[in-house]
Amino acid sequence: MSKTKNFMSIFIPTATVFISSFCIMVLELVASRLIANYLGSSLYTWTAVIGVILAGITLGNYIGGRIADTFHPRKSIAVLFAIGSATCIVTVILNNIVGRWIWLWHLSWPLHVFTHVSLVFLTPSILLGTISPVVAKMALDRGLPTGRTIGDIYAWGAAGSIAGTFATGYFMIAMMGTITIIWTIGAVLLLMSILYWLKCWPLSLWAAVFIALMTVAMVPAEWAQETASLIALREGPDPSILYEDESRYYHIAVKRAADNPNRLFFYQDRLKHSEMLTDDILKLQYVYTRIYAVITEGLSRNKENLCAMAIGGGGYVFPRYIEKVWPGSRIDVIEIDPDVTRAAMQAFGLGKNTTINTIHMDARNYVDKLLEEKQGGREVPQYDFIYGDAFNDLSPPFQLVTREFNEKLSAILSDDGVYMINLVDIFDSGLFLGSVINTLKKTFPYVYTVTGGNISHSSRSAFVIVAGKHKIDLEKIISEYEGGELELWYLDDSDLSHLRQKSRSLILTDDYSPVENLLIPVIRDNARDISSEKYLEHAEELQQKGRFSESVKSYLSAIKTYPVVSVRSYNEVGILYDRMGNLEHAVDAFNKAIQYNNESGHKMGTANIRHNLGIVLKKLGKSELATEEFQKAVEELRRDLTHHPDLDNNWHALGLNFNAMGDFEAAAASFKKALALNPDNPVYHDHLVAVLEQDGRYGEAIQVMKKYIQLMKNSKRDEEASQLQRYLESLENKLKE
């Protein structure tokens, strides 16, 4: 009996610290995933999470010692566990609230990350840290040997941390998801509190509240989602999400564009990795993939099939492009995360019968495996093309940009093959870009760099680096195969000299590859970009509520935070001033949008802005100036349509400008083009009917209206269909007259 009593005397305290330490470590690992939607995943986020939680545990140990000396240990433990379970819920709520605070985005990026993590995770860390000292005091009060008891408490606490680490990293995140894990930890802590104080009725009350909140937060029913979003237990529902999952590496989401159901986006954490049109996968959406395509076309020398390797799968857009254009090719995709591949198959169009060969492992390990097989006398592929697509602008894998890795890639690259890398940097700072170029030149004798021509030297841009063993005329190849559609900037010797100077001729090696530090300017620029997006989202919300003056202020704050958004923001400000009747201010805002576009490196289309400006000038009675703006918009749209004749929105915009100038025939022809390309767009039907009616072409208008009504019926928009039916009758009456 004495042995059993002694066993329970030490078992209960050690089991308690095991569970509390297990929960702390689960919280630490989950913390980095929970904040990834707002802050991404980088060295900064991991540093902040580890530092803040260790600080919380330290403070908790200090406070817990005082609690142990002052209050009854068993009841204290029950209360601490109960409060800890409450803070788990608060963690979810705070993360959603803090992530939306605009003022945080004005801080430097490291301080922003630290502040966000501290506000969300410091309190639960402190509370869980208080438990171990109180448990130790409880064990000692039972008369157990001091040294052995303290040693057992420390050992089982460490064992709990180890178990929590492996369980979370290897199983729980992939199987349960971040939010479910947090609620599970909260439930465990609540159960522990009840076990320690069974007769405490407030704990039973809190258990009922906890279960109710967990139901609201976890049940997929619409009422639960709406209620949870109101109290920040969930993010607001996003109707654009088609697929969502959480893997060991990323939060994965596939979204559909609001303005085009055929346009899909593939997200990994905050990074929009891929974009595609489901009805035309050959129409590549990113400039870097189009550069990849034309270089591949130019260097393949009419080969029937290729041997290619892609480092990083994402949405598998470019590998599928190769599969389609060069059928029978060997395409090896090295994607570390099998859940990314699963998402691409289930929601992003990657077929299960694809000929693409996916290897789920780190690219460095795969290349090492190939080289071992080669040294062992086995035949391994010699790739014609290797594409690097595993780099984001926050935390690129350092092991894939070192000199040692480049040497290994060179060994599996054919003599006339090329290695292409897509990476993000700011040209003016150029630390990461310059270092990668410097490093590649140590392995490959010929290295070239190209990017989109419409970029700013002072903000983030995607660069494509092409490295090979033989000389190529990159500009000639691209110009021959891309048909003049791409406006590109080829970095020359002076540009490369600038990058070499900025990067201090740094060579990245396995021993020294500080990629996160090299990307600090990019991270800061990214923070300003995200901050401006918060202002823009707020401005749009205010605009929808009719609070136009406040919306204008929010747009102007976005411009001040991140001038790159000036074109978009000034255009919206002009629209708001127009709606408020302040036409002179509207003209000024539209002119500022055009001026910024002309002066900055970010050349964007101004046809829409010029159309808006022309409309306001007409209202002011300045018809000649208005016509000039409409004509400039028409010229720009025609240039774009020469290269991209299948852009229905451009044909629609062209029609709007012709209509504004009174050229109804040209407007109708343009609207018909838009409608032919996108027959399910109700706006195109509406505008075509209106311009045909204005032109007195009632018979044609009636035919279009009948199709419009059928479209509404097919979409189950019966009320709108009935309204259009009355409109149709009025058109038929006009035809009879």
Predicted feature descriptions by range:
Residues 202-300, 448-544:
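Soluble small-group transferase modules, centered on the S-adenosyl donor enzyme superfamily
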Residues 536-540, 567-579, 604-618, 648-659, ...:
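Conserved alpha-helical positions within TPR/SEL1-like repeat arrays
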Residues 563-564, 598, 604, 638, ...:
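Short coil turns that delineate tetratricopeptide repeat
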Residues 1-244, 256-261, 270-273, 297-306, ...:
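Alpha-helical transmembrane segments of multi-pass membrane proteins
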